[in-house]
C-alpha cells in the first residue's frame, strides 16, 4: 500500500470527522460552555450584590443599634428623672403629713392641757372650799359656794 494514499485517506477521514464534530458535536459543547460561563458570571455578580447587601445590612444594623442605645439611654434618663420627681413628691407629701400630724398632736396636747388645768382648778377650788368649811365649821349655801368656786377658778 502506498503511503500517500493512506495518508490521503486518513486526511479525508480526519476532515470528515472534524466536519462532523463541528456540525453536530461542537455547537452543544459550546452552548454548554457559554451557559456555564453565564452561570459563573451571574454567580459572581450575585456574590458581589450579596457582599454589598451585607455591608449595607451591617451598616443599617449598626445605626439601628446606636439608635436603640440612644433611645434606651433617653428612656433610662427619663425614668431616673421621674423617679427623682416621685421621690421629691413623696418627701413633700410626707413632710406635709408630718406637719399635719404634729399640728393635730399639738392641738390635742393643748386641749388636754387646758382640760387638765380646768379640772385642777375645780379640784383646788373644791379643796379650798372644803378646807374653808372646816375652818369655819359651817356650811356655805350653794349660791355662795358657787360664787366662791368661780372666783377662785378665775384667780387661778
UniProtKB/Swiss-Prot annotation:
Source taxonomy: Bacteria, Pseudomonadati, Pseudomonadota, Gammaproteobacteria, Vibrionales
General function of this protein: F(1)F(0) ATP synthase produces ATP from ADP in the presence of a proton or sodium gradient. F-type ATPases consist of two structural domains, F(1) containing the extramembraneous catalytic core and F(0) containing the membrane proton channel, linked together by a central stalk and a peripheral stalk. During catalysis, ATP synthesis in the catalytic domain of F(1) is coupled via a rotary mechanism of the central stalk subunits to proton translocation. Component of the F(0) channel, it forms part of the peripheral stalk, linking F(1) to F(0).
Protein's name according to its UniProt entry: ATP synthase subunit b
Record key words, sorted: ATP synthesis, Cell inner membrane, Cell membrane, CF(0), Hydrogen ion transport, Ion transport, Membrane, Transmembrane, Transmembrane helix, Transport
Record text on subunit structure and interactions: F-type ATPases have 2 components, F(1) - the catalytic core - and F(0) - the membrane proton channel. F(1) has five subunits: alpha(3), beta(3), gamma(1), delta(1), epsilon(1). F(0) has three main subunits: a(1), b(2) and c(10-14). The alpha and beta chains form an alternating ring which encloses part of the gamma chain. F(1) is attached to F(0) by a central stalk formed by the gamma and epsilon chains, while a peripheral stalk is formed by the delta and b chains.
Pfam families xref list: ATP-synt_B
Cellular localization per UniProt: Cell inner membrane
Family classification: Belongs to the ATPase B chain family.
Superkingdom, taxonomy of origin: Bacteria
Transmembrane region(s): 7-29
Family matches, as Gene3D superfamilies: 6.10.250.1580
Keyword Transport included in the entry's annotation: yes
One MF term in the entry's GO annotations: proton-transporting ATP synthase activity, rotational mechanism
Membrane protein topology class: Single-pass membrane protein
InterPro entries membership: ATP_synth_B-like_membr_sf, ATP_synth_b/b'su_bac/chlpt, ATP_synth_F0_bsu_bac, ATP_synthase_B_chain
Organism expressing this protein natively: Vibrio vulnificus (strain YJ016)
